[in-house]
C-alpha cells in the first residue's frame, strides 16, 4: 500500500467479503480524492492497437455501483491472495516507481486469476502539488519521467502482440515529452533542452528491456 492512501475503518472487511469468490486473485478498493472517486482501474489490456492506450475500458468513464471484474489496478491497497504470490511471484522490483502494478496485474490475469474492483471498500488518497503552477509541479516530478517513459516502453515491448505496439506506442509517448521539453524549456523552469537525450535514453532502455533504478 502506498503511503499516500488511507483505508477507511471497514475497508479490509469490505474486501474480504469477496475473498471467497471463485478465481479471484486480487481485490481492489475504491479510492477517493477530496471525497470524489479517483480511479485509473480498467477493464482490459490493449496489446494490439498501437495508437490507442494500453488501458481499455477505464472505470473513470463508468458508473460502478457493484463489484466488477477488471484487468488492472494500482498498488494502492489491493488485496492479493497468497496462492497468486506463490504462482506468479513478487512484483518486479526493477520496475521502479512506475508500471510495477500494471506488470503484476498482467501476470496475474495471464495466470488465470481474476481481479475484482470492490466499490464499497473505500480508501482516501492524499493530493500532492495541489497549489503548484504547471512549471513547478512538473519540475518536482521530472525525476520520475525517466522511469515513466522507460517502464511504459518496456511494458509495450515485452507484452505487445505486434511490432507496432512493441515500438511505436512507446515512441509516440516519448516524442510527446520531447516536444514539451523542446518548446517549454525557454519559458519554463520545468524542463531543459538537456532533458531531451535523457527522455530518448529512457525509451531505448525500455525497448531493450534494461530496467533497474539509476
Descriptions of predicted regions:
Residues 78, 84-89, 94-122:
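A short, conserved alpha-helix in the catalytic core of glycosyltransferases
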Residues 118-137:
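Active-site donor/metal-binding and catalytic loop motifs
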Residues 60-80, 102:
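A recurrent flexible, glycine/aromatic-enriched loop bordering the glycosyltransferase active site
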Residues 10, 14, 103-107, 151-154, ...:
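Alpha-helical elements of Rossmann-like donor-binding domains used by nucleotide-donor carbohydrate transfer enzymes
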Residues 2-6:
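The conserved acidic donor/metal-binding loop of glycosyltransferases
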